[in-house]
Regions:
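Nucleotide-sugar donor-binding/catalytic module of glycosyltransferases
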Residues: 1-113
């Protein structure tokens, strides 16, 4: 049986502190577990850094990057995350969104066809 491919999950954030924990938990609790989580913050001013720092020692979190200055450009954040990604697949998971816990379990096999 083939090993499950690694999925790199990039979470770009700017001032979404109120959603961050739920978003990150909706990723970490996926039924598909071969993931790396890349957390990015674009110089938030709402305390998002505190939430992200709670995950710094989590085994699934490969990177937490905190910008000192806001880029004003989400595409720069996406690109930064893609450069860090080691997975076969990359999922840009916006910070103010949620997903079903079976999302990756359903999507990865379709991409593998």
């Amino acid at each position: 049986m083939n090993a499950l491919p690694l999925v790199s999950v990039v979470v770009p954030n700017y001032n979404y502190k109120r959603y961050l924990n739920l978003r990150i938990q909706s990723i970490l609790q996926q039924t598909y577990q071969n993931i790396e989580l890349i957390l990015l913050d674009d110089a938030s001013t709402d305390g998002s850094e505190e939430v992200l720092s709670d995950y710094q020692n989590h085994a699934k979190v490969s990177h937490i990057l905190l910008n000192e200055h806001n880029t004003g450009n989400p595409f720069k954040q996406w690109f930064k995350g893609m450069q860090l990604a080691k997975g076969k697949y990359i999922w840009i998971a916006e910070a103010d969104d949620l997903c079903e816990l079976t999302f990756l379990e359903k999507v990865v096999p379709l991409m593998e066809k």
